Amino acid sequence: MTFKWNVHYTGSKGNSVSIYTNQFNILVDAGKPYKFIEPLLYEKHFLIFTHRHGDHFKPAVYKKIRENFPNIKILANEEVSNLMFEKTKIPADVVFSDNFQFQIGTMKFTTIQNYHGAGEELVDCHGLIIEDIESGEVLLYATDLSTTIDYQEYLDKNSLQVDYFLLESNYDPQVIEFYESTKAHTGFDIFSNGSYRHLSSTEHKEFTEKYCKPDSIVVPLHQSETYSTFEGLIKRTKKDENRLTMEEVEEWKKSKNK
């Protein structure tokens, strides 16, 4: 196995993932307090920040990393690097854009744009693909995205299939549809107020099935505690006046199939 990884934290409460290759080691994001991030920084060559949201980048944590781990090279897109300079006066070592590439030994690293938000809320966000050009193994890392179109374009253009998917699977559209059909729903537009910025479980499944190899490994990231499963939704509403039950879910499913 060319790649190893450790998903330390994923989700709206903080994100940080280690990726190990036979040429270099990367920490992706540092979206937790420093005491949680510091143990993850040893033996890392690069730290890449995917975007500016607080569950991925914290200026105070970034400043302490710079002070205590000066040999780690920091990679960030222009929006994040500008925020780094604004808050700490220290920009990223490498400022990248879409399809930025570098190669160390047999490892080829490419940044891919993530669509995360829309209109004025659009955030400059990136994921990555790492290819071992010797073994042919491919790792894909992406979270906080609403579509995989740019990944599909890159994989198709380069005739690649993926060995290791570290990919967001945030919500199940059926769970949201069911919740919005019940009296427990408050009228809050779940999709428009956040879910549209993330990848659904159905899109996750379609994409991974299309680009997987026979023995690919798929690791779902950033799964919503409430909206990724019916069980999560039921748990979320168990203390509400109009709490939901699995019996109601089954009745709703039957009504949809009529």
Question: Could you say what each language-model-derived stretch is?
Answer:
Residues 152-252:
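Cap/insert and terminal regions of metallo-dependent hydrolase folds
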Residues 10, 30-32, 52, 79, ...:
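Active-site metal-binding loops of divalent metal-dependent hydrolases
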Residues 2-8, 16, 62, 142, ...:
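Extended recognition/assembly regions associated with phosphoester-bond processing machinery
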Residues 36, 79-86, 175, 226-230:
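Short, charged/polar "capping" segments at the starts of alpha-helices
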Residues 100-168:
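Catalytic core of the metallo-beta-lactamase
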Residues 1-40, 124-144, 164:
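Conserved beta-strand hairpin/beta-sheet module of binuclear metal-dependent hydrolase folds
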